[in-house]
Amino acid sequence: MTVNSKRIPFGKPMLEAFCMDPEYTNLNSSSCGSWPKVVSKQIRDYWSLLEAQPDLFSEFYQGLVLQEARLGLARLVHAAVSECVLVSNVTTGIFTVLYNQEFEERDVVVTLSTTYGAIDHGITSLAETRSFKTRRVEFELPTTGEKIVSQFETTIAQIRAKGLRPRLAILETIVSIPAVRMPFEDLLRVCQKECIMTLVDGAHSVGQFEVNLQELHPDFFVSDCHKWLFVPRPCAFLYVAERNQHMMRSAIPTSFGFIPKNGNSQLPLWSQMVSANGTASSFETLFAYTATSDNMPHLCIPTALRFRRDVCGGEAAIYEYIKWLAKEGGDKVAEILQTEVLEEPGLGAGADGQMRDCGIVTVRLPLAIATGPSTAPAHVPGGALTEKEVGPAVRYLTKALADRYKTWIPIADCRGWIWARLCAQVYLEVSDFEMAGNALKVICEEILSREMGQEISDSYRWHD
């Protein structure tokens, strides 16, 4: 499908190219994402083709487009196409890698205190039936990248001092919430020096900032495409360095590409799904046909990439704008609330820290938690919230944002305060962040004055 090559300015003009309700302000790209109308039309066209000739579409046509999608992603992240396969989401990709590891009893999987909850649970679940141990690198935000790296190195030394082997480290590019960019490049270098395998959770990466896997050199890398790349959900890809592909014996679920220890993989004779030229590796074959799946989001990757190139002006322009907007918008929200953004402590005025080198910003709300650490002041206008009040307050806040302001903002607690995560995007402007800041200010004042009402909206209520 051809994308209209006319460049559209970022901000409000770009919003018309997307599927969003014009009355809705999407400040949460890093959860559900969003995609342009041309991609929406593309997925509907593919559905029509599938339903018109289901077998012919599935067995002949979609394989060609999926190969094009993998090629586009490989170019985007500077990797070989033979190292990139398509999966439904990051959690699936990460668990697939973990499932295929042959752990020994002295092996340790190293995580961070900021590791995404679903990943943490997946590791705990697997450890119940596999012979490996887990160790978490503990630190509290806000902190500096140097301190995180130092604590990581200390933890590795402690593991080895006990006669154990740090086998695999799970790193993240951006913490989900409270959102900050991690020093993953430095952590990767430490792991490479220490001969520790690396599995990078890049859920919030591709489409938000440049990812160069040739330079990073991870063992495994997974990223969602539906968060920042303008692709329908769910959509992700898994990168496995060629040197490690022998470890990957099964996709999830196990299907025709599985290679028995004393045999070969055999796709059905009728399947044309692997590649147009039939030169796919065993690793590619493993993920080419994993039972009946919804491949529609993956089929839209080429259209999304063309839109980003032709209509948005290219990846570099997108990265520059959303990083600038997150900085300006986040500062504006903090100014309205008279609080602060989450970043490295002690940064001078106008200094740029690594933790904000992305399109997401986390801003402290004027809502302290009474049982928080000493970093929370003794006096807050209206008084601090008790632990019992926090849950109802957050529910009230998010519901009021939805009902009154037609937006939604993720909320988290950190070091005795409640924080809000806001995402920049090409169809947003600083004025959208100003709206969010003013909305948060009004609602927080209601919470602190204990004037919370019963926020109910029939438009958001599920019906049987």
Curated annotation (Swiss-Prot):
Keywords: Alkaloid metabolism, Lyase, Pyridoxal phosphate. InterPro entries: Aminotrans_V_dom, PyrdxlP-dep_Trfase, PyrdxlP-dep_Trfase_major. The modification N6-(pyridoxal phosphate)lysine is found at K227. Induction: Expression is induced in loline alkaloid-producing cultures as well as in planta. GO terms for molecular function: lyase activity. The keyword Lyase applies. Pathway: Alkaloid biosynthesis. Loline alkaloids show broad-spectrum anti-insect activity, and different lolines may have different biological activities. In vitro tests of NFL, NAL, NML, and semisynthetic loline derivatives with long carbon-chain acylations on the 1-amine have shown that many are effective against both fall armyworm larvae and European corn borer larvae, but the effects seem to differ depending on the modifications. N-Formylloline reduces the weight gain of fall armyworms by deterring feeding, and does not significantly affect corn borers. Its EC number is 4.4.1.-. Pfam families: Aminotran_5 (PF00266). GO terms for biological process: alkaloid metabolic process. It comes from the Eukaryota. Its cofactor is pyridoxal 5'-phosphate. Belongs to the class-V pyridoxal-phosphate-dependent aminotransferase family. L-cysteine desulfhydrase-like protein; part of the gene cluster that mediates the biosynthesis of loline alkaloids, potent insecticidal agents composed of a pyrrolizidine ring system and an uncommon ether bridge linking carbons 2 and 7. Lolines are structurally differentiated by the various modifications of the L-amino group and include norloline, loline, N-methylloline, N-acetylloline, N-acetylnorloline, and N-formylloline. PANTHER family: HERCYNYLCYSTEINE SULFOXIDE LYASE, L-CYSTEINE DESULFHYDRASE. This is L-cysteine desulfhydrase-like protein lolT2. It comes from Epichloe uncinata (Endophyte fungus).
